[in-house]
């Protein structure tokens, strides 16, 4: 049982017959990032499946200053340790508590990719310069050093900064070429 706001440290991999992660998800149509250490089979709110209420997209690649995502065709395509973006398909106000359910091998660390996630809070100095997704889902902008918001919470994903000069932002291309 994993809960938002708490780090997850797993020194060795293991197999879980049932795993859950609970957090408040936006229901205003805004995009957010997520990474989980298990394969997801359902999203529930108040005990009712709401997986059909969400669009979930997986990272495809980065080309120049464009980050490309492809929509999952089925929630069971959601794989452990891979970072995703998701949004509720309505324009209501606020949040709803969501429980992500699944099972499988729980790895010690998330998959390492340009778009990656973390199971522990990444603090200001280490987060600075990495890129966070805006709520509109249109771009990744750099986290500024020495600001309270320059953190990456556990179970969130980010675009890693490069070693050389980095662009001011990356645009997002959603499934089928639609730009957020």
Where are these regions (language model features)?
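A short, polar beta-strand/turn micro-motif
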Residues: 1-50, 71-139, 144-180
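Short linear interaction motifs
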Residues: 63-71
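A broadly used, surface-exposed interaction patch
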Residues: 49-57
